[in-house]
Amino acid sequence: MTPTLRRKLEALAERREELERLLAEPDVVADNTRFRDLSREFAQLEPIAIALADESRAKADLAAAEGMRADPDLRELADEEIAAAQARLLELEQELALLLVPRDPRDEGNLFLEVRAGTGGDEAAIFAGDLFRMYARYAERQGWKVEIESDNPGEHGGYKEVVARVVGRGAFSRLKFESGTHRVQRVPATESQGRIHTSAATVAIIPEADEVDDIVINPADLKVDTFRSSGAGGQHVNKTESAIRITHVPTGVVVECQTERSQHANRDKAMKRLKAQLLDAERQRQDAAQAESRRLQVGSGDRSQRIRTYNFPQGRITDHRVEGLTLYDLPNILAGDLDPLLQRLSHEHQVDALAQLSAG
């Protein structure tokens, strides 16, 4: 472990001890907000304290085993214990390094999933539908809930656009690297010559932020349109203009909601999503400025970036952000078995974040 990382660990250990003292003070206990915030910070630092204590014990075990080597009768046993202690220390060093990677406070929250057909006409819409089903199936495996907020079906299947809210613990942490352009290579069902066509769809993963209630939007900046819903709710929704489309004029961000029976409920949902989008756009701008010099763009969330290719003739899926990340398991991945991809992307992101910490 580099001296820089070791210093960071020591500083966090000191902060944890300080928090322990603060949480025992009567005035802190009496202040519910401060007590909650400090308790949350303490809980985040506790795994580091536990790992450091384990490391101290492993170092003591190593020293004791090395002392045993002076006795010829115990040398073989000592060598075994030395090897075990060294392996444990290496394991703990890696664990501590990963614990240093700053946690994204949005990781445990819900998200908005937006899938839009790109270039490729009908085939792009069909592919957008494939992607949406892939994420919906993955969400089902995790026990998450998927609520469609608005959709625009393609003429021959799939979606020109579909927006859904994904509700479940850790949803954003799992799917946050999916934003970007996804490309498909396959022979369309309507292709009589057997030629491979290339089309694309874009995916946006937007965290549902707790802070949206604090965002103030000038009503003069909004253009609100109502229209007849084509979504859930049966015949009733088609009889009244209950669906809402809100345009944030300064940024051009447009959101729709048509899933509720009442215009008021649709407006509330649309405003919540608009605020989440504006907050996410500002965070992306800040992240892009900070990440300008970074090698790896796994966590950039840039929706214009081509991140992945799905090649049907070869049954291959390639993620272009990570060298060598190609899997020949396309049917299972489209069926919702995304973990082999998502875990590798998460690991690469952690490695990159550690490199930034070491350089800092």
UniProtKB/Swiss-Prot annotation:
<dbReference type="InterPro" id="IPR000352">
    <property type="entry name" value="Pep_chain_release_fac_I"/>
</dbReference>
<dbReference type="GO" id="GO:0016149">
    <property type="term" value="F:translation release factor activity, codon specific"/>
</dbReference>
<comment type="similarity">
    <text>Belongs to the prokaryotic/mitochondrial release factor family.</text>
</comment>
<dbReference type="InterPro" id="IPR005139">
    <property type="entry name" value="PCRF"/>
</dbReference>
<dbReference type="Pfam" id="PF00472">
    <property type="entry name" value="RF-1"/>
</dbReference>
<dbReference type="Pfam" id="PF03462">
    <property type="entry name" value="PCRF"/>
</dbReference>
<dbReference type="InterPro" id="IPR004373">
    <property type="entry name" value="RF-1"/>
</dbReference>
<keyword id="KW-0488">Methylation</keyword>
<dbReference type="InterPro" id="IPR050057">
    <property type="entry name" value="Prokaryotic/Mito_RF"/>
</dbReference>
<protein>
    <recommendedName>
        <fullName>Peptide chain release factor 1</fullName>
    </recommendedName>
</protein>
<dbReference type="InterPro" id="IPR045853">
    <property type="entry name" value="Pep_chain_release_fac_I_sf"/>
</dbReference>
<keyword id="KW-0648">Protein biosynthesis</keyword>
<feature type="region of interest" description="Disordered">
    <location>
        <begin position="281"/>
        <end position="310"/>
    </location>
</feature>
<dbReference type="GO" id="GO:0005737">
    <property type="term" value="C:cytoplasm"/>
</dbReference>
<comment type="function">
    <text>Peptide chain release factor 1 directs the termination of translation in response to the peptide chain termination codons UAG and UAA.</text>
</comment>
<feature type="modified residue" description="N5-methylglutamine">
    <location>
        <position position="235"/>
    </location>
</feature>
<keyword id="KW-0963">Cytoplasm</keyword>
